[in-house]
């Protein structure tokens, strides 16, 4: 069958150009040049169930390692200015049901939209200031506030940069509050 990476890449391509639901993925795929490039892809292989089957086999640790390998490869190959980074922490509310016990991220918390009745997920992102190249991200529970989380997120950011961030005094991090 198709690899987990293929499903991830296809979902990313679809979201970038013409987002459709997973149940409409085959119809979208047929309308693209991808069908000629990947003739082994079938209607059944692009069913929504196949997407969920493949995504459920990926854990956050594996995805984090893949992200880090990608970032490291780009930083090794490109001239990306790491002297300044921008940090943004945000949250977004979801419609995860109140009785859904499987969700560990979606929690009730404060958000600017005033939707405290809905579960939310928090997201932190570091990008290079000059090129807006994403360096690090973290997703965490919606009931954890930014002030508490910032210290942990910044330490994890520097840990992810590794030797590239030896002299933290040489990097300026810009954020709003």
Describe the role of every protein-language-model region:
Residues 1-108, 124-145, 151, 155, ...:
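Dynamic "connector" segments at or just before major functional cores
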Residues 115-122:
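Short, flexible loop/turn motifs enriched in small residues
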Residues 163-177:
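Phosphate/diphosphate-binding loops
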């Amino acid at each position: 069958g198709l690899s987990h990476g293929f499903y991830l890449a296809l979902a990313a391509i679809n979201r970038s150009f013409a987002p459709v639901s997973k149940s409409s993925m085959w119809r979208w795929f047929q309308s693209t040049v991808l069908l000629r490039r990947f003739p082994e892809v079938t209607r059944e292989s692009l069913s929504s169930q196949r997407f969920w089957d493949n995504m459920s086999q990926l854990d956050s640790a594996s995805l984090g390692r893949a992200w880090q390998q990608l970032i490291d490869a780009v930083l090794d190959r490109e001239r990306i200015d790491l002297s300044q980074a921008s940090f943004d922490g945000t949250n977004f509310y979801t419609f995860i049901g109140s009785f859904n016990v499987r969700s560990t991220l979606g929690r009730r918390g404060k958000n600017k939209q005033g939707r405290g009745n809905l579960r939310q997920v928090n997201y932190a992102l570091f990008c290079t200031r000059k090129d807006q190249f994403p360096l690090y991200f973290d997703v965490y529970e919606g009931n954890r506030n930014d002030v508490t989380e910032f210290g942990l997120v910044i330490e994890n950011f520097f840990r992810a940069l590794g030797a590239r961030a030896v002299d933290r005094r040489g990097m300026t991090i810009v954020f709003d509050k």
